[in-house]
Regions:
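A glycine-biased, small/acidic residue-tolerant capping/turn segment at secondary-structure junctions
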Residues: 399-424
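A short, Trp-centered hydrophobic/proline-enriched beta-strand micro-motif
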Residues: 180-190
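Extended, charge-enriched "interface" segments that sit outside catalytic cores
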Residues: 1-116, 135
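A short core secondary-structure module
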Residues: 214-260
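Internal helix-loop-helix
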Residues: 84-176, 227-228, 357, 361
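Extended amphipathic alpha-helical segments enriched in small hydrophobics
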Residues: 308-374
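C-terminal helix-coil-helix/basic helical segment that borders enzyme active sites and/or dimer interfaces
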Residues: 358-393, 399, 406-409
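A glycine-rich, basic-preceded beta-loop-alpha segment at the flavin cofactor/substrate interface
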Residues: 255-257, 264, 276-307, 324-341
Length: 424
């Protein structure tokens, strides 16, 4: 039987000149600047591990995990069906899978558990690759990683908590930490009236018995912006008679009862939606003082410094992924008789994007080398101002960098089912 003519023109056109998806590639092997930086900063021994990690990060299935984690936002319920207060945030399985991979590969732990030469550089490079898949879930990974220097200021608490914090496993269940082999740590500092001016905090800490470092307190007040509220414990700032102090507050009490740390709402954020951020109230939440009473900012600043380091590394990762997406598009798209990446003006734009991306990554890994060499006075002095400086500039630049990358891709880059809108 002969084929009937298409009288109704059901097939109107052939799809041509559309780039294929950037997937099933190796993020490490295609990043020559990263390879050079890893060698230069002293982590050449991690090449094979980073190559394997780069392969995982570039697979279509891995990239889809990031998409699914953001497409399916976290949900919150205050009570279970029997009326018990649960304060439970539920995440899509894709979020949990990304968390599992991160923690099983030691993104929160390796420089602390195996402080060999180049450990911070190798971990930063791995975090850089991981963040390009999906950035939001990296928040609790970073906070867990960054909590260690602050906890070490209170040795008895560190001895109790660090084995589970540093375990290379992930347990997302809403259970007391005593029933889990691994835990994650969050941070709760800001309040409504002060924001980053944490010395204006009004949350109060009342001693249960004796007062001072390592002692138990009950916290009463609120925190206005708490990300990853399902972490198993939080480093919290609260006022005592001696001033602002730092506390470790678990979500569950030692007797297995729920600590009265009550989530009020999830923030309806712009972007970064896979990472739940919340407002909470503390109604006598049990916590233990970390560090010297009245020196809470000085105590928690060790954690803040390491979160700043990860924030600039993650921001550099976002810039790298924006560059990769723009470059891939321009290599496979033609206009006015030539590939976009052959057009002189486009070549200038792509070169500018590459220079800024590589500069951000280079800075981050140089700081990682300083963190690896704290016995050297020059490196120790460098490691103090470098994270906040990098956190300011590198974290400030990605939106503008992403806008320029999206301008290379134009309209198709703005679709929410793609990775690119998450980079803005």
């Amino acid at each position: 039987m002969s084929k009937s003519p298409d009288h109704y023109h059901a097939s109107t056109h052939d799809v041509v000149n559309q780039p294929v998806a950037l997937e099933n590639y190796n993020l490490f092997e295609q990043d020559l600047a990263l390879q050079a930086a890893v060698e230069r900063e002293g982590a050449g021994q991690a090449r094979d591990d980073l190559r394997h990690y780069g392969h995982w990060a570039g697979q279509a299935e891995t990239i889809d995990l990031g998409h699914q984690a953001n497409l399916n936002k976290p949900t919150f319920r205050t009570h279970d069906r029997f009326g018990h207060r649960v304060d439970e945030v539920s995440f899509h399985p894709a979020y949990h899978e990304l968390m599992r991979v991160a923690l099983e590969h030691g993104l929160h732990s390796t420089p602390w558990t195996d402080p060999a030469p180049g450990a911070q550089v190798a971990r930063a490079a791995r975090f850089y690759l991981h963040s390009q898949v999906e950035a939001a879930h990296c928040c609790p990974v970073t906070m867990t990683f960054a909590a260690i220097p602050t906890l070490q200021r209170q040795p008895e608490l560190a001895k109790l908590w660090m084995p589970k914090i540093l375990a290379n496993s992930y347990d997302p269940r809403n259970l007391p930490d005593t029933e889990k082999n691994s835990v994650t740590i969050g941070m709760a500092m800001t309040e409504k009236q002060g924001g980053s001016d944490v010395r204006a905090n009004t949350t109060r800490a009342y001693p249960v018995g004796q007062h001072g470092p390592g002692q138990a307190y009950e916290l009463v007040g609120h925190k206005w912006f708490v990300s990853a509220p399902m972490c198993d414990a939080f480093l919290v700032l609260a006022q005592t008679d001696a001033g602002l102090s730092c506390f470790l507050m678990p979500r569950w009490r030692p007797d297995g009862s729920k600590n009265p740390w009550q989530i009020q709402q999830l923030k309806n954020k712009m972007g970064n939606v896979a990472n739940a951020s919340s407002a909470v109230e503390l109604r006598g939440a049990l916590a233990w003082m970390v560090g010297e009473e009245g020196r809470g900012v000085r105590t928690i600043i060790d954690m803040v410094a390491m979160t700043r380091f990860d924030c600039m590394t993650g921001s550099a990762a976002g810039m790298r992924q924006a560059l990769a997406q723009a470059n891939h598009h321009c290599r496979h798209r033609s206009a006015f008789g030539a590939r976009l990446n052959e057009q002189p003006l486009m070549q200038n734009v792509l070169a500018d994007l590459a220079i800024e991306s590589e500069a951000a990554m280079t800075y981050a890994l140089r700081v990682a080398r300083a963190l690896d060499n704290q016995s050297n006075e020059h490196e120790r002095l460098l490691a103090r101002p470098a994270p906040p400086v990098g956190n300011y500039w590198i974290c400030y630049r990605p939106p503008t960098h992403a806008y320029e990358a999206l301008d290379c891709i134009r309209c198709s880059g703005l679709m929410s089912y793609l990775l690119t809108p998450r980079l803005v």
